[in-house]
């Protein structure tokens, strides 16, 4: 009754792929590609993870599986939500649009920054990512939903960092156009809202800020 569990070839591009079946027989073979890891959840609670490679799912060699055994089946089936998460960098994600209006700390007027460019990112905490994703973009085997969610948090992050920079430097928001290199440097250092979901920004390219 063993099962072969792996990410299907036609879904290799997805940042997160959730295995459709939660009932997993003992001795099933799990294959994790070199650019991803596999996370096990039960009722939305994280239980453990497996690195790249081929794994035989049995409790002797993977102790956390003990928490997933279904006693009602004579103990030969695990109940688990299995997520495959990309751990390699994801490059050249384009972004563009308006931030919410912000009050200029010098002029005391509301201005609306517009930004565009592209960023590269990597998931450094897959558990946080799946927990956040579970609440926001889950179940859709669709990268667009996942990427839109990441972009929303990217914009929130830029807004937070802009606010911090203007407060610290005493500069007007209208000076932001000349501060894009500094701003992208800070985002690479620490992007607040993205850090909450285990994402690190590696680079921002062609970063442009203007005002509508």
Question: Which role fits each region the language model picked out?
Answer:
Residues 1-212:
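N-terminal hydrophobic membrane-entry segments
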């Amino acid at each position: 009754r063993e099962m072969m569990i792996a990410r299907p070839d036609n879904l290799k591009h997805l940042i997160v792929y959730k295995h459709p079946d939660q009932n997993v027989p003992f001795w099933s073979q799990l294959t994790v590609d070199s650019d991803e890891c596999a996370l096990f959840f039960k009722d939305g609670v994280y239980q453990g993870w497996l690195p790249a490679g081929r794994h035989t799912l049995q409790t002797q060699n993977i102790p956390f599986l003990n928490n997933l055994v279904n006693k009602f089946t004579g103990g030969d089936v695990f109940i688990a939500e299995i997520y495959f998460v990309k751990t390699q960098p994801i490059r050249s994600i384009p972004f563009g649009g308006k931030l919410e209006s912000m009050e200029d700390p010098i002029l005391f007027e509301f201005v609306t920054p517009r930004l565009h460019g592209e960023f590269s990112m990597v998931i450094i905490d897959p558990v946080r990512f799946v927990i956040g994703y579970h609440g926001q973009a889950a179940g859709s085997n669709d990268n667009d939903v996942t990427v839109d969610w990441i972009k929303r948090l990217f914009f929130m992050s830029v807004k937070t960092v802009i606010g911090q920079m203007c407060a610290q430097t005493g500069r007007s928001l209208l000076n932001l156009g000349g501060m894009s290199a500094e701003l992208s440097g800070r985002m690479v250092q620490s992007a607040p809202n993205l850090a909450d979901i285990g994402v690190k920004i590696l680079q921002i390219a062609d970063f442009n800020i203007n005002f509508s």
